Structure formats: structure tokens, C-alpha cells
A protein has these predicted regions:
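FMN-binding flavodoxin-like domain, especially the glycine-rich phosphate-binding loop
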Residues: 171-211, 215-218, 260-276, 286-383
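Metallo-beta-lactamase
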Residues: 2-5, 99-148, 192-198
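Active-site neighborhood of phospho(di)ester-bond hydrolases with catalytic His/Asp-centered motifs
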Residues: 45-47, 69-77, 97-100, 159-163, ...
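Active-site-proximal loop/helix segment associated with metal-binding centers of metalloenzymes
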Residues: 144, 148, 156, 164-191, ...
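Conserved beta-strand hairpin/beta-sheet module of binuclear metal-dependent hydrolase folds
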Residues: 2-60, 150-153, 157-161, 254
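Structural motif
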Residues: 41-43, 71, 133, 157-160, ...
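Terminal amphipathic helices with adjacent charged low-complexity linkers/tails
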Residues: 215-240
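Active-site metal-binding motif and surrounding structural segment of the metallo-beta-lactamase
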Residues: 40, 51-98
Length: 383
């Protein structure tokens, strides 16, 4: 795939994977991106997942013909990008691997060698001259592993962004970028907003025309749009006004309460309402929704003196990813001693800048006139 006159795509698509990282549903597969810069010296940028090593090597040979790579640049050591380092180094015994000091420590763990006689260790501001192309390296620790670096080619104004600006989905499937990029960012990188913000500040000083991520499409235009969304996501800002109702329901009574709240919110002019049944929806999508919109209602039952397991999992996902700067409403259901609201408050107590609704809904087994009135009041407060 042509990117610029000297930069080509040599990655692969994976339609065999059902759960990315063992947890994220990827109905449209994944891409594992790799690139090659062809100059006086040749640099291959990252490898691919372990199952695609031979396809990837064939892609390299197709682009290079009789020439051989001089460098393998490793931005990130997660196995979906690093699994074929040793395969590459054996295929090209004259090549040198270029990466961060922490990455070489990880190579020792993964492959039993840190390529001490065939390596270049780079850090912040270091450069690698290829000819007319020169790569400048920028450290990006904890976006989202500690060894991560990104690199910038000033000749073609290309940022090789590691997992930054990645998305779910293979490249032979057309779909909206933001939806699956948001789910990818919130799920995988979302905990590290502060570190992502630091990287964005570094990127602001670069003249970026093209972004080459390790997953998803190459971004060749409208860079301000992508950088703006990353600023929203990593800054834990509200992307869109609306209310997310996340509920669990054992016998349908809490579900009915959630549906009534949805109806009342729309009647009161709420611009957008999203409802997620946490037992049946894609949990990662529900988490994505909670970070996308400004308001969240948690509706669940008291269960074994706690909250229903899917709600506990959902809240844990939120707090693990530093959920903050939102308005939260609570709805609890119980037949005796309902305590779910109190438990959810306790689970969220470490979250920053959460505004709790004054109106909390208490359902005693099934909807009543009293709980319907509480739902009406909550809807007016949220809308």
C-alpha cells in the first residue's frame, strides 16, 4: 500500500481473531500495521502478530525486491506488534534493531536475547538518519506500556504513533473511524489520560501531515479532527451531551424502571439517551458510552448484600479507567434492605469531579407510584 513515495504499508489483516487482547469483541477483525521507509538505508517499522509472520515477510520482500532492510524500529513491545522480531532478525542477520532501553529488556524476556551486538538504543530526541528521511524519537511512556516510543519523519511529515490513534477493525472493512477508535482508546489506553495528554503536547510541536498507527487506517488528512478527539478522550472531557442508562435486572423490574426513565428523559427534551443492559450488551461499548456522554444513570439490584455482578464489573471498568468529570444518577431495587445505591457510591468514591443527582430512585421489588414519581424527578434533573 502506497503512503508516500518512500513509505509503504506492509501490515496484515486478521479476520480469525474473535477477542482482541482476550476480551474485546472485534466483529470486523483487526489490522496489525507495519511500514517500511525506503531510502539510502531501509527501516521497517514494527512487526505483526505471531500468526502472520510469513505473510509479513512476504510483504517486505514484495516492496523491497532484492534490497534488504537495514533497521527494524520497534515502537511497542506488546506481542501483537513484536512477536516477529526474532523471525525478522534471523531472516535479516545484517539488520539492526532500534528501540528504547525498556523495550530491549522486554525482548530479553520474550526472546531470550536483547540483541546486544545488533542494536541501537534510542530515547527522547534521538535521531536515525536513513538518507533524506530522518526519524526523530519521542518517548511515550504508559501510552500504554512503559517502553513505548513514537517517531516522526520530518521529510514526509509522518508520525508513527504506536498504539496511539489506533482502532478496532481490519483495513478491508469500511466503517466510521471514531466509533471503534473511541472503544479502542477507552478500553485499552483510557486509564492513561495524563500520559496521553503529555504525548499530545509533544505532538503539538510537530508538523504532522500523516499519522501511521499500529492498528487501523493510516490517517492522511484532517489531523486536527483526530488530535481533537484524542484531547477530549484523554482529558476525560464530555464529547456529547446525553444520558447513558446502564442497568442490570433479574426479573425485569429494574429494566422497566430504566425504560420508564428513558421515556421521561425524552419527554423532557434530553438530546440523547443510550440504554445498556449490562448482562447482554458488549461491555466495552457500554464503558465507551459512559465516557462519551456527560451523564450516567446506574440502575441495579441489591444482590448478596452487594450489587449485581454485571454492575460491579461495569463500575470497576469505569474506575480502572479514571472515570471523572461526569454527572451520575442512582437507581436501586431491593425486596428487603436495598443497599445498592450506597454500595455504588462507595465504589465510585475515588472518582474525581463526579456530581451526584439529588434525586435517587428506590424501588421496592416493583415500580410503584412513589418510585415512578422519583423517576420523573430524576428525569427532570438530568434533562
Amino acid at each position: 500500500m502506497f503512503i508516500t513515495n518512500d513509505i509503504r504499508y506492509i501490515g496484515v489483516n486478521d479476520h480469525q481473531v474473535d477477542l482482541f487482547e482476550g476480551q474485546y469483541v472485534v466483529p470486523n477483525g483487526m489490522s496489525y500495521n507495519s511500514y517500511v521507509i525506503i531510502d539510502e538505508k531501509i527501516a521497517v517499522m514494527d512487526t505483526v502478530d505471531q500468526h502472520f509472520g510469513q505473510e509479513w515477510l512476504a510483504n517486505i520482500r514484495t516492496e523491497l525486491g532484492e534490497r534488504k532492510p537495514d533497521f527494524l524500529v520497534v515502537h511497542h513491545m506488546e506481542p501483537d506488534h513484536s512477536a516477529n522480531i526474532d523471525v525478522f532478525m534471523n531472516a535479516y542477520p545484517e539488520a539492526t534493531v532500534v528501540s528504547s532501553a525498556k523495550a530491549f529488556g522486554m525482548m530479553k524476556q520474550f526472546f531470550g536475547t536483547d540483541y546486544a551486538d545488533r542494536r541501537i538504543v534510542v530515547g527522547e530526541g534521538d535521531t536515525l538518519a536513513l538518507g533524506k528521511h530522518t526519524l526523530t524519537f519521542v518517548t511515550a511512556p504508559m501510552v500504554h506500556w512503559p517502553e513505548v516510543i513514537v517517531s516522526y519523519d520530518s521529510c514526509d511529515k509522518v508520525l508513527f504513533s504506536a498504539d496511539g490513534f489506533g482502532k478496532f477493525g481490519a483495513l478491508d472493512v469500511e466503517e466510521d473511524w471514531a466509533c471503534e477508535a473511541r472503544r479502542y482508546y477507552i478500553g485499552i489506553v483510557g486509564k492513561y489520560g495524563k500520559q496521553t495528554q503529555a504525548l499530545l503536547k509533544k505532538a503539538a510541536g510537530l508538523d504532522i501531515a500523516i499519522i501511521c498507527p499500529l492498528h487501523g487506517p493510516v490517517l492522511t488528512e484532517n489531523q486536527g479532527y483526530y488530535l481533537g478527539l484524542y484531547d477530549i478522550w484523554s482529558g476525560y472531557k464530555v464529547e456529547r451531551e446525553g444520558v447513558v442508562i446502564a442497568y442490570t435486572s433479574i426479573y425485569g423490574n429494574t429494566r422497566k424502571a430504566g425504560e420508564l426513565l428513558e421515556q421521561k428523559l425524552l419527554e423532557n427534551g434530553c438530546p440523547k439517551v443510550v440504554v445498556n443492559d449490562l448482562a447482554r450488551c458488549d461491555m466495552a461499548e457500554a464503558v465507551e458510552d459512559a465516557f462519551r456522554y456527560g451523564k450516567l444513570v446506574l440502575a441495579t439490584t441489591t444482590y448478596n448484600g452487594d450489587v449485581f455482578p454485571f454492575m460491579k464489573e461495569f463500575i470497576n471498568h469505569l474506575t480502572e479507567r479514571s472515570y471523572q468529570n461526569r454527572t451520575v444518577g442512582l437507581m436501586e431495587n431491593g425486596t428487603w434492605t436495598p443497599t445498592a445505591a450506597k454500595t455504588m457510591l462507595k465504589m465510585l468514591e475515588g472518582s474525581k469531579n463526579i456530581t451526584y443527582c439529588e434525586n435517587t430512585v428506590k424501588i421496592l421489588s416493583a415500580l410503584s407510584d412513589a418510585s415512578r414519581a422519583q423517576i420523573e424527578a430524576l428525569a427532570k434533573e438530568l434533562a
